Amino acid sequence: RVPEDSALLTWWDYGYAITDATGLATFHDGGGQTSPKTYFIARGLIGSDPDELYEITQYLATEGNRGIAENNISPEALIKAVREPKHKPWDPIYLFFTADMTGKFGAISKLGSWDIENGGSKPSIYQYLACNKFTNKEMTCRGAKIDLQKGFINDQLTLKRIVFVRNGQVLQEQKFGHKRGLTLQLIINGKNIVEVQLIDEGVFRSNYNQMFMLGRYRKDLYEETF
C-alpha cells in the first residue's frame, strides 16, 4: 500500500481523479496543467536520462513553481537549477505510469521537447501497425511488409531492433546490424501478439518507454512497486 503522505508524479489528466479516489497529492492536475511543472514533467518522461527525471521530480517536490519562477533568469540558469536540486523530499514520491499515456505520448512529447530558448518542438508518437500474418521470416501488416531476418520495412525503411514484450518485461530483443533505424515493439498477451508498435530511437530510449513498456530502470534510483 502507498503511504498516506506520498505524492504521485503522473500526467495531469488523472490528477483530480487520483486525489479524489486515494487522497494522495499529485504534482499537477486539470487546474494546474498550464503551470511550468507540466513542461518539466513532460521533459522527464520523454527524455532518455534517468538522472534528469529523478532530478526533475526532486526539484518539483521541494521547490515547485516558486522555485521555477525564482530561477527563471535565463534558460540555462533554470535548467541548471532543476538539474541540481538542493533539497530532498520529506515524503515518498511515486512515478505513476498509465497505459493510456502511450496514446498521449505525442501530446506529452510536444510539450516536453519544447525549446525554451528558441521555441518550437519535435513531437514523436507510437505508431500502431495492423498486422494479420506473422512467420519467422516476415510480418504482413496494412501497408507494410516487414522482413524479420534482414530488418527492413517494404525493403526501404530500416529496423534497428525488434523487442518482444509481455507484462511490461522484455522477453527477447533482436538487433539488426543497421546503425540507424526504427524499433518494432511487439506486445504479447499469452501466446498472441496483441499490439505492434513502430517507434523512433527517441521514443524507444525515453524514460516512459524504458520504465513502463519494457520494465527497465536504474535500480540505484528507482524501485518498482505494484
Kindly label every feature range from the protein language model:
Residues 1-226:
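Extracytoplasmic
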